[in-house]
Amino acid sequence: MPLIEAIAVARATASELTGLPVDGIAATAPDGSGGWRITVDVIESAARMGENDLIASYEVHLGSDGGLAGFDRARRYRREDREGGA
């Protein structure tokens, strides 16, 4: 599956499984067996003021056929901490 298609599947999967809006794609990597590992950031809690949303990063694992092979929450952080390497 081409990367652009895998990203679309990962975005839809993360949104469907969490019920939350997707904020963006943080990382992509082939998994070595023809599939993909894609990190999708979703907004778990929107900030009331400013840019301090609570973001969760989910690892979406897609098999070579594009089917869901795994789904894990990797971390949670405040948007202001994103660039700080949190």
Name each region found by the language model.
Residues 1-28:
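Short, non-transmembrane alpha-helical segments in secretory-pathway proteins
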Residues 11-14, 18, 40, 58-62:
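Amphipathic alpha-helical interface segments used for dimerization/assembly
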Residues 16-17, 43-54, 83:
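Short, cysteine-centered beta-strand-loop-beta hairpins and adjacent loop/turn segments enriched
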Residues 27-30, 50-52:
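Short secondary-structure boundary/capping segments within folded domains
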Residues 30-35, 63-67:
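A short, structured loop/turn motif at beta-sheet edges
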Residues 34-42:
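A short hydrophobic beta-strand element
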Residues 50-76:
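A short, surface-exposed beta-strand/turn
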Residues 78-86:
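A short, polar/charged loop-to-alpha-helix boundary motif
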